Amino acid sequence: MNKKLFGVSFAQKKYDLALKYCQPAAEQGDPEAQYYLGLMYNKGFGLKQDYTEAMNWYLKAAEQDNKDALCSLANMYLEGEGVKQDYTEARNYFIKAANLGDAAAQYNLGVMYSSGDGTKIDYIEAKNWFLKAAEQGQAKAQFNLGVLYFNGQGVKQDYFKAVEWHQKAAEQGYADAQYNLAKIYYLGKGVKQDFVNAKKWFEKAAKQGHAEAQCCLAGLYIQGLGVKQDLMNAKKMARKSG
């Protein structure tokens, strides 16, 4: 029997079947099975939620350098799930996963260092971790890296690089990046002022329910910037933005 059938069953939300395949594999020391079993206990998928059991299986997988388990342990400490909230422990587990190349862990470290969660704010460290995740295509990291370049935090202010990283995240559909990119085009920061492109990116973010983008798009319709003046559409966008 393919021991990885538990992953397929889990993805299909067939938790009884996943447990059938997962339990014996986990007990035989398979780190991926141990992670999935921990996840099932953690979230109550097919089992009664049990944080103690979740941590037990996550730890077994983490000892074998399973990145998902390391991140899950970090998140348990970060959120105080079944343990006392401990940012230092969370950061330590994120660092282990990040050093194994996990983009989500790298992004989360960037967030912790940029926001000062359990540590002194350090924009240089934040930039380093965001960059590692961004280079792996992680949209939220690309967006945050763009913000650091725009504000000159941890790096020399560079509007061109701010645009570059916002663009990468925006093209992946990340609404906050689309909104920021639209503002950059609207203001002409690092790019030639371009109301057509501003409208394009405000519109993409607005379609995802981004309230500020909807409000800005309404403003463009009122003024006729980058689009033909259209008061009816302006009112429609304004209503959506609340």
Go through the PLM ranges and name each one.
Residues 2-9, 36-43, 72-79, 108-115, ...:
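Hydrophobic face of amphipathic alpha-helices that form TPR/SEL1-like repeat modules
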Residues 215, 219, 228-242:
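TPR/TPR-like (Sel1-like) alpha-helical repeat modules
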Residues 24-25, 60-61, 96-97, 132-133, ...:
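Canonical positions in the second alpha-helix
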Residues 1-36:
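N-terminal segments that cap or nucleate solenoid repeat domains
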Residues 7, 14, 27-30, 43-45, ...:
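Short helix-capping/linker turns of helical repeat alpha-solenoids
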